């Protein structure tokens, strides 16, 4: 994947302002609320019975932070995203059996969360760069699937 200097700048400038805990928790909560079938991968997380329960669930918050922290590794390694996510791809494929389509859904939700948090700073050009990034990350995570 080729990244232009402008794309890299747009991605890193937003990433530098992201509150990983808040945005990660919000993104994962939105995934579980908007696409309820994804909840089956989080049965051990406890109460996921309503939007309020999901948004307040400490396990959702903690895992959301973990997910977005990993996403930060992509931002730091834009030229080697496949390598960066090789182990996570194997884990999600072979051990957790996560539907790889869910990576695309979460990526799209992350773009929505960033747009909501950054408003006019999240320009269409910025959105395009982030949309490209979430697609590349989703593809890297789905790589170990057969």
From Swiss-Prot:
State the InterPro entries in the record.
Answer: Globin, Globin-like_sf, Globin/Proto, Hemoglobin_b, Hemoglobin_oxygen_transport
- Residue spans crossing the bilayer: none
Would you tell me the Gene Ontology cellular component terms?
blood microparticle; haptoglobin-hemoglobin complex; hemoglobin complex
**UniProt cross-references to Gene3D superfamilies, sorted A to Z:** Globins
- Residues annotated to bind heme b: 63, 92
Q: Which UniProt keywords apply?
A: Heme, Iron, Metal-binding, Oxygen transport, Transport
Q: Name one Pfam family in it.
A: Globin
Tissue spec: Red blood cells.
For molecular function, the Gene Ontology terms on record are:
haptoglobin binding; heme binding; metal ion binding; organic acid binding; oxygen binding; oxygen carrier activity; peroxidase activity
* Globin domain location: 2-146
Mention one GO biological process in which this protein takes part, according to its record: hydrogen peroxide catabolic process
Q: Which SUPFAM superfamilies match?
A: Globin-like
Q: Which family does it belong to?
A: Belongs to the globin family.
Tell me the PANTHER family matching this sequence: HEMOGLOBIN FAMILY MEMBER, HEMOGLOBIN SUBUNIT EPSILON
Quaternary structure, per UniProt, is: Heterotetramer of two alpha chains and two beta chains.
Function noted in UniProt: Involved in oxygen transport from the lung to the various peripheral tissues.
**Name of the protein described by the UniProt record:** Hemoglobin subunit beta
Instruction: Tell me which species this is from.
Output: Streptopelia orientalis (Eastern turtle dove)
The gene from which this protein is expressed is HBB
């Amino acid at each position: 994947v080729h990244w232009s200097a402008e794309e890299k700048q747009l991605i890193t400038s937003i990433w530098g302002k992201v509150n990983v805990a808040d945005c990660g928790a919000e993104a994962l909560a939105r995934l579980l609320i908007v696409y309820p079938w994804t909840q089956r991968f989080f049965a051990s997380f406890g109460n996921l019975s309503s939007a309020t329960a999901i948004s307040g669930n400490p396990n959702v918050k903690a895992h959301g932070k973990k997910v977005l922290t990993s996403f930060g590794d992509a931002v730091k390694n834009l030229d080697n995203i496949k390598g960066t996510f090789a182990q996570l791809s194997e884990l999600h494929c072979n051990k957790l059996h996560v539907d790889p389509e869910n990576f695309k859904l979460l990526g799209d939700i992350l773009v929505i969360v960033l747009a909501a948090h950054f408003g006019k700073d999240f320009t269409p050009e910025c959105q395009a760069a982030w949309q490209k990034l979430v697609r590349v990350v989703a593809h890297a995570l789905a790589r170990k699937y057969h």
